[in-house]
């Protein structure tokens, strides 16, 4: 278990680890207790009542946060023909076809999101073993395999995030920065939770939304009362 620094320990003392805080109170605590000098990311960890070992209990998708994440995301688009121009006009940072595949095979990875047109997926499939483990493989479920390139790029630039349940049944997602007004963090969190509820697998049994913890990059976790989201 990693040893925490003095600032973290002092911040953690101000959080009741047994208490489930109301949403706004929890987010205000996270902002107040963020110990680092840089603008830390605020993240939500959501525990879901699913068994990810079963294919019919996977939770995966994407959602546009109304206030974005506070981070400028670098977008790579795999495209050819007129779609190259469309991607460039939409604000994609890198656009290309087979040459981009070769570049990634050579070790280049300077992007946060990859989008591809369907006719490029056979080429992109060659680097699936590189992109997949990093969560960068374009996928129709997250809207990153599409011919509507302009919309896909615009959504990512506007604050679209992807989410995917891990082996323990948790979703980890950024919801902003500690510099955000608490109302904006709250709206982003609500948008994320609403998306997760809509994505509930039919095979999921029992309580679905089992817990929410919000934290900053370097700060302690604060438990959130889930009643507001399931009421």
Curated annotation (Swiss-Prot):
PROSITE patterns (UniProt xref): RIBOSOMAL_L1
Pfam family, one: Ribosomal_L1
InterPro entries, alphabetized: Ribosom_uL1_bac-type, Ribosomal_uL1, Ribosomal_uL1-like, Ribosomal_uL1/biogenesis, Ribosomal_uL1_3-a/b-sand, Ribosomal_uL1_CS
A molecular function GO annotation: rRNA binding
General function of this protein: Binds directly to 23S rRNA. The L1 stalk is quite mobile in the ribosome, and is involved in E site tRNA release. Protein L1 is also a translational repressor protein, it controls the translation of the L11 operon by binding to its mRNA.
Subunit organization: Part of the 50S ribosomal subunit.
Family to which the UniProt record says this protein belongs: Belongs to the universal ribosomal protein uL1 family.
The protein's name in its UniProt record: Large ribosomal subunit protein uL1
The encoding gene: rplA
